[in-house]
């Protein structure tokens, strides 16, 4: 239902959420008081909302997402001191990513053939979220582009 909701300009009330708590693996990311930070990455969020705007819906949707978190980790929303929501229009504005899609294209089977690491411009390689296996904070695109570069230079791994 998430894809259809986004396609129709609706916000899914129970979306797929990838919940990252970065400070559990890198304590240096905690603030001066030792607070954790986390990110909720929500799949299938529309760029344009039907019948409303992101400005009108942002705060409500953050609360909705936290209520989903509360279902699986009761009390989570009570622990949140601050939020920094990045809906697609803010992602586009803040990071310059067209239509605010951090993976550039959808991560579906139909898009398994992503951008090549070696571009048509000699010596220019791509290691972005648009390359296989896509985005998130995993570094695989960079690793794979480096392997391709080594191969092109005739250097064995």
Regions found by a protein language model. Name each.
Residues 1-86:
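C-terminal segments that line or cap access tunnels to active or ligand-binding sites in enzymes
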Residues 2-6, 76, 91, 149, ...:
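Generic structural signal of hydrophobic/aromatic residues within well-ordered alpha-helices
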Residues 11-20, 71-132:
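A glycine-rich dinucleotide-binding beta-alpha-beta segment and adjacent secondary-structure elements
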Residues 35, 57-65, 100-157:
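C-terminal structured subdomain/cap of oxidoreductase catalytic cores
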């Amino acid at each position: 239902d998430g894809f259809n909701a986004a396609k129709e300009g609706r916000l899914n009330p129970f979306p797929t959420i990838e919940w990252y708590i970065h400070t559990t693996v890198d304590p240096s990311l905690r603030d001066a008081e030792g607070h954790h930070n986390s990110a909720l990455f929500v799949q299938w969020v529309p760029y344009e909302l039907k019948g409303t705007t992101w400005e009108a819906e942002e705060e409500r949707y953050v609360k909705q997402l936290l209520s989903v978190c509360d279902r699986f980790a009761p009390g989570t929303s009570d622990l949140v001191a601050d939020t920094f929501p990045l809906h697609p229009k803010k992602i586009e504005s803040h990071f310059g990513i067209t239509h605010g899609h951090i993976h550039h294209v959808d991560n579906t089977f139909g898009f398994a053939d992503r951008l090549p690491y070696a571009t048509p411009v000699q010596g220019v390689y791509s290691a972005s979220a648009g390359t296989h296996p896509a985005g998130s904070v995993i570094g695989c695109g960079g690793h794979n582009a480096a392997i391709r570069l080594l191969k092109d230079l005739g250097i064995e791994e």
